[in-house]
Amino acid sequence: MSASSDAEMAVFGEAAPFLRKSEKERIEAQNKPFDAKTSVFVAEPKASYVKSTIQSKEGGKVTVKTEGGATLTVREDQVFPMNPPKYDKIEDMAMMTHLHEPGVLYNLKERYAAWMIYTYSGLFCVTVNPYKWLPVYNPEVVAAYRGKKRQEAPPHIFSISDNAYQFMLTDRENQSILITGESGAGKTVNTKRVIQYFATIAVTGEKKKEEATSGKMQGTLEDQIISANPLLEAFGNAKTVRNDNSSRFGKFIRIHFGTTGKLASADIETYLLEKSRVTFQLKAERSYHIFYQITSNKKPDLIEMLLITTNPYDYAFVSQGEITVPSIDDQEELMATDSAIDILGFTPEEKVSIYKLTGAVMHYGNMKFKQKQREEQAEPDGTEVADKAAYLQNLNSADLLKALCYPRVKVGNEYVTKGQTVQQVYNAVGALAKAVYEKMFLWMVTRINQQLDTKQPRQYFIGVLDIAGFEIFDFNSLEQLCINFTNEKLQQFFNHHMFVLEQEEYKKEGIEWTFIDFGMDLAACIELIEKPLGIFSILEEECMFPKATDTSFKNKLYDQHLGKSANFQKPKVVKGKAEAHFSLIHYAGTVDYNIGGWLDKNKDPLNDTVVGLYQKSAMKTLASLFSTYASAEADSGAKKGAKKKGSSFQTVSALFRENLNKLMTNLRSTHPHFVRCIIPNETKTPGAMEHELVLHQLRCNGVLEGIRICRKGFPSRILYGDFKQRYKVLNASAIPEGQFIDSKKASEKLLASIDIDHTQYKFGHTKVFFKAGLLGLLEEMRDEKLSQIITRTQAVCRGFLMRVEYQKMLQRREALFCIQYNIRAFMNVKHWPWMRLFFKIKPLLKSAETEKEMATMKEEFQKTKDELAKSEAKRKELEEKMVTLLKEKNDLQLQVQSEADALADAEERCEQLIKNKIQLEAKIKEVTERAEDEEEINAELTAKKRKLEDECSELKKDIDDLELTLAKVEKEKHATENKVKNLTEEMAGLDETIAKLTKEKKALQEAHQQTLDDLQAEEDKVNTLTKAKTKLEQQVDDLEGSLEQERKLRMDLERAKRKLEGDLKLAQESTMDAENDKQQLDEKLKKKEFEISNLLSKIEDEQAIEIQLQKKIKELQARIEELEEEIEAERASRAKAEKQRSDLSRELEEISERLEEAGGATSAQIEMNKKREAEFQKMRRDLEEATLQHEATAATLRKKHADSVAELGEQIDNLQRVKQKLEKEKSEMKMEIDDLASNAETISKAKGNLEKMCRTLEDQVSELKTKEEEQQRLINDLTAQRARLQTEAGEYSRQLDEKDALVSQLSRSKQASTQQIEELKRQLEEETKAKNALAHALQSSRHDCDLLREQYEEEQEGKAELQRALSKANSEVAQWRTKYETDAIQRTEELEEAKKKLAQRLQEAEEHVEAVNAKCASLEKTKQRLQNEVEDLMLDVERSNAACAALDKKQRNFDKVLAEWKQKYEETQAELEASQKEARTLSTELFKVKNAYEESLDQVETLKRENKNLQQEISDLTEQIAEGGKQIHELEKIKKQVEQEKCDIQAALEEAEASLEHEEGKILRIQLELNQVKSEVDRKIAEKDEEIDQLKRNHIRVMESMQSTLDAEIRSRNDALRVKKKMEGDLNEMEIQLNHANRLAAESLRNYRNTQGILKDTQLHLDDALRGQEDLKEQLAMVERRANLLQAEIEELRATLEQTERSRKTAEQELLDASERVQLLHTQNTSLINTKKKLENDVSQLQSEVEEVIQESRNAEEKAKKAITDAAMMAEELKKEQDTSAHLERMKKNMEQTVKDLQHRLDEAEQLALKGGKKQIQKLEARVHELEGEVESEQKRNAEAVKGLRKHERRVKELTYQTEEDRKNVLRLQDLVDKLQAKVKSYKRQAEEAEEQSNTNLAKFRKLQHELEEAEERADIAESQVNKLRVKSREVHTKISAE
């Protein structure tokens, strides 16, 4: 895949970063450090594979260190090499250096993490479901993929679609796109995108035409194709466990195209709608979307029309599972469905019928029935629901209920009424609901197809298959079996097609290759289902038996397959899971199936009485749905005498298999394109990938089999031209220069000259093929070679430059010597009298001549100036023409290339046509011969024709008789009706004989019904006979037409007959030979039978041994299970012992600590300590003994288990080898038996055939007749093919004529171009460099244009220099003339020097003109060469006239590209103007800073009020800190990104500083604003001082209050101890947080100082820029005085201005992006600062509580004085901290002075401070640890005076486990609190400094403060916010790299 530049990817718009890596990312990947020897993937149970680094290798074992830091030792076969970084996120996984499972998995994972969801894997495309919307299907993406080859664009479903479209047009072959995968993988979405693509690209210019021709359509064809999806999804899609929008039916959409590639029509075939979902759903699923759309109340008129409510729970059929789906808006979907119905042209009546039938199905589920008293008969339980359902279906409610409860059943020839139980009625209602819904769905598909059939001419189609994915549910029924079977068939088709194509590629290229069949892996499961005696066969057989049940079906399955087929298993019983009856091992996993109700589902019976009501319904739609329905009873009665095997009505499984076979036939007739959809995880989480799940799908989908072929074959392949161009640098001497050499031969020579294994590559016809990994080796060799070449080139260039410099130094030295010599000589003679006289007189002598020379020089100067102006004008004109010629040359090159490609294609097709022609001629010859043989049968055919004529006449007579019979029957019918009326009248009058009359009436009615049936049968016969008559007449006509031809064939047939007679004699002779052979074979057969009997006995013995071994295996397996259970029990006991040991250890540690802390207090405590210590030692010994015992037991069990496993493994291996050997021998014996049997059968057949050869001549005649018919069909096919070939030949002729015309046109264009080239020969200054650009594309052309522009500017500068020199000379001449006139004698020397200078300048000007002319001459030669090249190109064009149509297409595409680039140029100009406007708007941004500052003042007041409530948030803060840890982890990731952005922004700032020349006024305003900031900061400092004083006073009051309550606290000592435990834990956490915040503030100060240094440097750059501005102003004034140089100077300044504006625009955009990131980071900084403030209050509270305990201890203990001493020491430390704080205050004031000057850089400084967030946190944590160490050391020094203080300090840290308080602990608390008091004061001062720095951002703090208050509510949203930040960061990177 060629990597596109960011500029080329710009056409994809916002989708670019989701399709391909940016240039920056690709460069970073190539430069990323990588060690190919140690970087590997390692197999790991949890994550499947992990990235690791090899540490060591020893004895087949490898020790590695994983990414997570773990060290593993694995086998060498579990280690897989990692691909180099340049293959990261590769678009085609077949191109990877190392092909294996982990490489594919991690490539997909990394691309999925970057939201690149499409990836090629060789010949097909893999897509991973993103579970979120991505902007990769926008219209600009469709346009970008149109017409692109696969390798020209990133992987995408649009690329697959466009390739299929292009293949259809070029190969003239039907295409199909198979989108397969498991349920929930995204197949339906990709199907929509395919249809969207075709509907977009294939309708240009056709919409009006379609609208005109459609007439009745409500929308255009493309709209209708697109609208078919929403309608089908509403009625055919539902929520399942794995997919919210799962297609519950399969569809094959065929999109037909006309001859020009435009949309012609479309049709849809559907498969296996899951109609059971209408009445039943699982808990986590729901029914079809349409039910919930209707009840969404988006269209209230529907609710009223359908007589339903808006609550789905009111309807039993649709509320068994869930009723809402979060990802689907039912209201919007209803509008889309309703709109689709209108667009697809359904009539209003049909639309209403669809809704009414859907509502009726919902009402069906609510119909209630009950059992009659004392009977099993069911009766309606209310008629309200039935009335609604009947109303919606235009039925009579009473008739409907009667038909349900009392259906009429046909028994023999009579109909009787049958009673129904309640359950039977409910079953019938459910069946009717499913039938109505299914038939309505199929009717809608038929109507859609009618609407999409536009009757336009169509040639080829592209089919898109979207069928339900593989399903494994908790409850799997017949529907799931059918779906999974379909996927098995598709997977087998996929395997066969894809892998055969890959291997045929090798054969096509002429590479030796042994074919590997990968398509039979799934045959076992497929045969188990569909072959005779398979599951479907047994199911249909059971449906034939009236008394068959599910149990009998299951028993037959078990008898037939259980234990005989490896894919058929008995499921395991799992509690809580649905019952399963058998399991099948599919390619995607094992599925448990429940066969309940399969027989009924397969027969699909309906209540015929209700169906009859449907057929008579006034609703036309309902009546038409069931118009063709035939009852099972009628069919079964009719079939008894006709068929033996099955009924005439089709079962569901038979119909399914028929449709599936049709589908597979369709697919095999097309060229398929495969898209494999992958589910990344089971939880539908965007961005998450489960390794095992993905690997399972990759194995099932054939991805890894494809890689297996790549590993065996040659996955890397390069065209010879590309290989020569790229790798020629490896050995340039291998390819001779200056002579033509074929690319293939050059590649062969090049590879032969390189030291690589020759078996690792193969040469094909057009490509060179490489084994996996070799291409990576070649790339490394190429990189090394390029490095050497570049180093050598640099050395040569440096040497050349130094030599040039040395020559210049020598020339200057010689010039100095010459000048010095002449000056010395002149100084010696200038005072001579004669010389003075000479100086005075000589000018007078030549004054007149000088004037003439001056005049002449002026004229020459003027002429030179005019010529220069003309030259400039011509040069501009030539430059314009040159650009045109360059474009034309590029166009011609593209045309030549495209025509060459087209010519190659045409030649290939021509060769294929010639081959086909030869084959067809051979076939024609063969057919002709056969046709001659068929003439012999002509007489018989003539006789048959006469016989058929007689039969026709007889049939006509029969038809006449039938018509008479029909009339007679009609009369009898009328007579019968009259008789019935008479009988009815007699019945009214004769009550006495009513019984007899009733019987007679019944008999008459039956006779009447029989008559009607007979009449219907006769009518059917009449219709059949009419059709037969028509068919026979057509056959007669055909026979008459072929009569003449067969007469001609008769003679040849007679000759063939004679030939057959000769063959008969030969056959009789061979019969005798066969008899002899038979006798020999009989003898051999007897021997073989004897051997077979021996082998069979041997096999039986081995089978007995095998059975014994299997029993032994089972026993060993049971023993293994017992051992495993023992191991598990031992593990459990060991875990329990470990837990007891840990508990004992913890208790012992607590006891020891208490003993140590209480040691020395009293003698009782000492004794208790000794006892507890003894107990502790005893417990420890017991624990160690128990541990050793457990370890020994576990080791013994492990050893036993390992030995058992090894022994079993050896036995199993031996058994497997024996079994394989026996199976092999068995198969060989079977083959021999089959061969012998076949030979015997062949001999017997040959004997019988030879004996009856004479009698078989008649059979041969009949066979010849069949052959004649076949030949006739072949002749017709050949005739059609010949016509098609003639049409194609005519088309080719027309194309040749068009190309001839185009060639002549191009010749004329060539002549015109030649004339233009001759006119432009004189002054093409830049043609030399443009020559090189002709070999490159538009990128190189731009580069050449830049070079031309630079040279043009150099010429302009030279011209300006000449003009300045001439003007200066003119001024000097005028001065000299004036001086000469006043004092000619005295100024002779000066005039002479002026003359010399003037002459020298004129000479320089002439030399420059000559140089220009020389360049023009050089360019004339170059132009001549260009002309020759153009002529060569024109010759190439003439040779490529066979593909001119493709040339026109390429030309139009290139014109589009040029137009796009022109548009981009215009856009660039517009952006330049816009940037000038943006420069004026910069001043407004400065006011934003001021507004932000004012908002910060308001925030200060808000924060003051909020600080009063912080006391109540301590408990919340503890939880928030834990959550903050997670956020810090995310911040660390963000920090890395921000650091990278900081570097980019810093570089951009350096560029942007040049654009600040015009910002002096802004700087002044900023200084004024900073003065205001300073005053505000001073005021805030004063306010903070007041707050600190207030806090001190509050603390004093609290201390006094604590002293007064000391006695009360002594009584509540135990309670205080418990409180203190919690407080101490909180105190430690708060101290850490305070230290963290304090260090963050200190680090911010340090970073701020660094930033000040940077800003000072920036100020210096600004000063330099200002000085540069003054210089520019002076230069501008000089330019204005020089009118003749004005234009050149203006152009220079304009170019400078444009560059400056672009830099400023880039910098401003980057500054805006950076400010957004700064805002985000400010919020995080705010979190830390606010936390710090809360912690200050928390510490003060904790301090007050701790001081209460301290006061109590001071009065109770004698050693409180030592704690006071320690407090004094801490006071000294406090003083030191105060001094430090004062020093920091002075530094702060100095910094504020600097801030005043550079306020507008404050955001960047804060960003720099915040970007080091993680490092600051680490430093702060380190500092916290240092301070804790200092505290501990200080406590140790204090412990010298107080024994045991150190133990008490440790005890304070573990207060949670302490139950008693003693005096030593109080002393330690006193010390700790004193230190905390000092620290708090220091922290407050430092917090003030941090707050002063952050006060400009306080307005931004409000947002995060609010987030902290609602932390618990936002916990679930935190991760999504981090993801958004990542996406935003990527967009910023993308924008920066793009700009």
From Swiss-Prot:
Annotated region (Actin-binding), positions in chain: 660-682, 762-776
Compartments it resides in: Cytoplasm, Myofibril
Residue list for modification Pros-methylhistidine: H758
Entry-annotated residues carrying N6,N6,N6-trimethyllysine: K132
Molecular function in Gene Ontology: actin filament binding; ATP binding; calmodulin binding; microfilament motor activity
PTM-bearing positions, type Phosphotyrosine: Y391, Y426, Y1465, Y1493
Binding annotation for ATP: G181, E182, S183, G184, A185, G186, K187, T188
Gene3D superfamilies reported for this sequence: 1.10.10.820, 1.20.5.340, 1.20.5.370, 1.20.5.4820, 1.20.58.530, 6.10.250.2420, Kinesin motor domain (3.40.850.10), Myosin S1 fragment, N-terminal (2.30.30.360)
Pfam families reported for this sequence: Myosin_head, Myosin_N, Myosin_tail_1
Coiled coil: 844-1939
Source taxon at top rank: Eukaryota
PTM-bearing positions, type Phosphothreonine: T66, T71, T421, T1242, T1256, T1266, T1287, T1468, T1502, T1518, T1731
Myosin motor domain segment(s): 88-783
Annotated ranges, domain IQ: 783-815
Chief localisation class: cytoplasm
Keyword terms, alphabetized: Actin-binding, ATP-binding, Calmodulin-binding, Coiled coil, Cytoplasm, Methylation, Motor protein, Muscle protein, Myosin, Nucleotide-binding, Phosphoprotein, Thick filament
Modified residues (Phosphoserine): 627, 1093, 1097, 1163, 1238, 1244, 1262, 1293, 1304, 1307, 1475, 1496, 1515, 1555, 1575, 1601, 1604, 1715, 1727, 1740
Domain Myosin N-terminal SH3-like: 35-84
GO CC annotation terms, alphabetical: cytoplasm; myofibril; myosin filament; myosin II complex
SMART domains documented for this protein: MYSc
GO terms under biological process: muscle contraction
General function of this protein: Muscle contraction.
Stated family: Belongs to the TRAFAC class myosin-kinesin ATPase superfamily. Myosin family.
Comment, domains: The rodlike tail sequence is highly repetitive, showing cycles of a 28-residue repeat pattern composed of 4 heptapeptides, characteristic for alpha-helical coiled coils. Limited proteolysis of myosin heavy chain produces 1 light meromyosin (LMM) and 1 heavy meromyosin (HMM). HMM can be further cleaved into 2 globular subfragments (S1) and 1 rod-shaped subfragment (S2).
Subunit-structure text: Muscle myosin is a hexameric protein that consists of 2 heavy chain subunits (MHC), 2 alkali light chain subunits (MLC) and 2 regulatory light chain subunits (MLC-2).
Protein name: Myosin-8
Organism of derivation: Canis lupus familiaris
